[in-house]
Curated annotation (Swiss-Prot):
<comment type="similarity">
    <text>Belongs to the glucose-1-phosphate thymidylyltransferase family.</text>
</comment>
<dbReference type="GO" id="GO:0046872">
    <property type="term" value="F:metal ion binding"/>
</dbReference>
<dbReference type="InterPro" id="IPR005907">
    <property type="entry name" value="G1P_thy_trans_s"/>
</dbReference>
<feature type="binding site">
    <location>
        <position position="108"/>
    </location>
    <ligand>
        <name>Mg(2+)</name>
    </ligand>
</feature>
<keyword id="KW-0548">Nucleotidyltransferase</keyword>
<dbReference type="GO" id="GO:0008879">
    <property type="term" value="F:glucose-1-phosphate thymidylyltransferase activity"/>
</dbReference>
<comment type="function">
    <text>Catalyzes the formation of dTDP-glucose, from dTTP and glucose 1-phosphate, as well as its pyrophosphorolysis.</text>
</comment>
<dbReference type="InterPro" id="IPR005835">
    <property type="entry name" value="NTP_transferase_dom"/>
</dbReference>
<protein>
    <recommendedName>
        <fullName>Glucose-1-phosphate thymidylyltransferase</fullName>
        <ecNumber>2.7.7.24</ecNumber>
    </recommendedName>
</protein>
<keyword id="KW-0808">Transferase</keyword>
<dbReference type="Pfam" id="PF00483">
    <property type="entry name" value="NTP_transferase"/>
</dbReference>
<feature type="binding site">
    <location>
        <position position="221"/>
    </location>
    <ligand>
        <name>Mg(2+)</name>
    </ligand>
</feature>
<dbReference type="GO" id="GO:0009058">
    <property type="term" value="P:biosynthetic process"/>
</dbReference>
<keyword id="KW-0460">Magnesium</keyword>
<keyword id="KW-0479">Metal-binding</keyword>
<comment type="pathway">
    <text>Spore coat biogenesis; spore coat polysaccharide biosynthesis.</text>
</comment>
<dbReference type="InterPro" id="IPR029044">
    <property type="entry name" value="Nucleotide-diphossugar_trans"/>
</dbReference>
């Protein structure tokens, strides 16, 4: 299985920190944010990684990461001309993934769990897609999943619902088969002019092919000043705990 990391966008919610640097290069604990996605993939045995971002950010990423050798992976770079949505960014991974299944990470998602058990279950699934969910206290802020717990399927995904059916938000951790690229071709830009990943996931739902797992550890979308600070706190706590257990 290959890995794809989306690391684009202008990081407007993290201004002025992102005025001169891509948000995925900001520190989270002792490392740049982008390291965490790469290390999670590497720990799960996924070492062939595509990093997607805008052209102006690529020199910074390449200076930091090079070909990935220092982190035990192989990194390929792909330009997304404009930050036009997750599905648009993902569409540029088609040549890299070929006809293989793969895992997609949003580079600002910092989380505790190992990816390995989830990727193994997805490989056993054989086809379709899987998303990882997380219980949250403020479901009105997220895309929320209505689930069929018996069959481990997602019935629907509702963006920022006023009356959430559950408190299970869709995180930025997705697994797809090669069919995803034909689904991307079928969707249209949203009101904000972007190709939304929820529209792609809904096509999988229509075919009863979107499964889920729920993260057991902590998870943070580190896209704001508050959540970036929280992610650093949680990372430092986890590192201290690991040192204490040695």
């Amino acid at each position: 299985m290959k890995g794809v990391i989306l690391a684009g966008g202008n990081g407007s919610r993290l201004m002025p920190l992102t005025k001169a640097v891509n948000k995925h290069l900001l520190p989270v604990g002792p490392y740049p944010m982008i390291y965490w996605s790469i290390m999670k993939l590497q720990e799960a045995g996924i070492k062939d990684i595509l990093l997607i971002s805008q052209k102006e950010h690529m020199p910074q990423f390449y200076k930091l990461l090079g070909n990935g050798e220092e982190l035990g992976v192989t990194i390929t770079y792909q330009v997304q001309p404009a930050a036009s949505g997750i599905s648009d960014g993902l569409s540029y991974a088609k040549r890299f993934t070929k006809k293989e299944s793969f895992i997609l990470l949003l580079g600002d998602n910092i989380f505790e769990d190992s990816l390995k058990p989830y990727t193994e279950r997805f490989e056993q699934q054989g086809k379709g897609a899987k998303v990882l969910l997380k219980e949250v206290d403020d479901p009105e802020r997220f895309g929320i999943a209505e689930i069929d717990e018996k069959n481990k399927r997602i019935r629907s995904i509702i963006e920022k619902p006023e009356q959430p059916p559950t408190n299970l938000c869709v995180t930025g951790i997705y697994m797809y088969d090669a069919e995803v690229f034909s689904y991307i071709e079928q969707i249209s830009p949203s009101k904000r002019g972007e190709l939304e990943i929820t529209d792609v996931n809904n096509l999988y739902i229509e075919n009863s092919q979107l499964t889920y797992d729920v993260l057991s550890g902590w998870w943070v979308d580190a896209g704001t000043h508050e959540s970036l600070y929280l992610a650093s706190q949680l990372v430092h706590q986890a590192l201290r705990k690991g040192q204490d257990e040695k």
